[in-house]
C-alpha cells in the first residue's frame, strides 16, 4: 500500500489529463520542427496587474535578414468546456488594418506600413467580414475562457517585449483543443456557423486604440500554422527592409 500522501503513477497521469502541459509541449515541438527557436517556462511582468506570469511558449523565427526579432507568443488552452465562436462582421473602410505589437522604436514605421502588413500576414482572406471578437459557447457563469485567452496572449506579448534590448515584434497566438466556429449573419438575420481550424481576430485591447491581431488555432492545425508564420514572418521582414527599415538583427534572443 502506498504511504499516506503518496500518489501513484496512475493518479498523476489522471491529473495530467486535465492539465495543459501536453498541449504546450506539442505546440513548442511543432514550432521547433519548422525552424523556430521555441522556449517554454519564460516569464513576463503583466503590465496590468504587475504580477509575474508564465508564458506557455515563446517561438522566434530564425530569419536570414530582418529589421527586428519576430516572435510568436503563445497561450495554450486545454480542456475548454464549449466550442469557441469567432464573431465576424462587416467593418468600415480601414478598420481591417492593424499593427503587430512591437518595441517603441518600431511602432511608427509599422503604423505607416499597416496596409502592407494586413496584406502580408492574413490568415483569413484579407476582406470583409472581419473577425473582431471571440466567445466560449454553451457555458454557465460569467467566466469566458476564450475572451480571457485573447487578453492573456496579448498581455504576454507586450510583457515579453518589455525585456527586449533590440527592435522586436510579437504576434499573440492562442492554441486550443476545442472546436472553432465563425459566426456571421445572412440578409435575413439568420446565424451562419462555419467550423474552421484557425482564424485571425482583429481585437481592440482594453486601453489600446488601434486593433491588433491574435491568431486562434486548433490543436490539429498548429504545425500548419507554424509553417505559415515562418514564411510570412520572413516576407514581412523583407518588405519592411524594402520600405526603408534598416536590417538590424541576424540572431535569436529567446
PLM segments and residue spans:
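Intrinsically disordered, low-complexity Ser/Thr/Pro/Gly-rich regulatory segments
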Residues: 1-254
Amino acid at each position: 500500500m502506498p504511504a499516506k500522501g503518496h500518489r501513484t503513477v496512475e493518479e498523476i497521469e489522471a491529473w495530467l489529463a486535465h492539465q495543459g502541459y501536453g498541449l504546450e509541449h506539442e505546440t513548442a515541438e511543432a514550432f521547433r520542427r519548422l525552424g523556430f527557436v521555441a522556449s517554454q517556462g519564460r516569464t513576463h511582468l503583466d503590465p496590468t496587474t504587475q504580477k509575474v506570469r508564465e508564458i506557455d511558449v515563446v517561438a522566434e523565427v530564425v530569419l536570414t535578414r530582418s529589421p527586428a526579432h519576430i516572435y510568436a507568443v503563445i497561450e495554450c488552452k486545454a480542456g475548454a468546456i464549449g466550442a469557441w465562436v469567432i464573431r465576424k462582421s462587416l467593418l468600415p473602410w480601414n478598420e481591417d488594418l492593424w499593427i503587430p505589437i512591437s518595441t517603441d522604436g518600431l511602432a511608427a514605421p509599422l503604423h505607416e506600413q499597416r496596409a502592407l502588413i494586413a496584406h502580408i500576414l492574413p490568415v483569413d482572406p484579407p476582406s470583409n467580414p472581419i473577425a473582431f471578437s471571440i466567445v466560449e459557447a454553451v457555458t454557465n457563469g460569467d467566466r469566458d475562457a476564450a475572451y480571457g485567452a485573447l487578453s492573456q496572449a496579448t498581455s504576454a506579448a507586450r510583457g515579453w517585449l518589455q525585456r527586449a534590448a533590440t527592435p522586436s515584434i510579437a504576434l499573440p497566438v492562442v492554441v486550443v483543443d476545442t472546436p472553432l466556429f465563425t459566426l456571421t449573419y445572412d440578409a435575413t438575420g439568420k446565424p451562419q456557423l462555419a467550423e474552421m481550424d484557425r482564424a485571425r481576430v482583429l481585437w481592440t485591447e482594453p486601453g489600446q486604440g488601434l486593433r491588433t491581431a491574435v491568431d486562434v488555432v486548433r490543436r490539429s492545425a498548429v504545425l500548419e500554422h507554424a509553417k505559415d508564420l515562418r514564411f510570412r514572418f520572413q516576407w514581412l521582414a523583407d518588405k519592411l527592409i524594402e520600405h526603408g527599415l534598416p536590417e538590424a538583427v541576424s540572431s535569436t534572443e529567446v
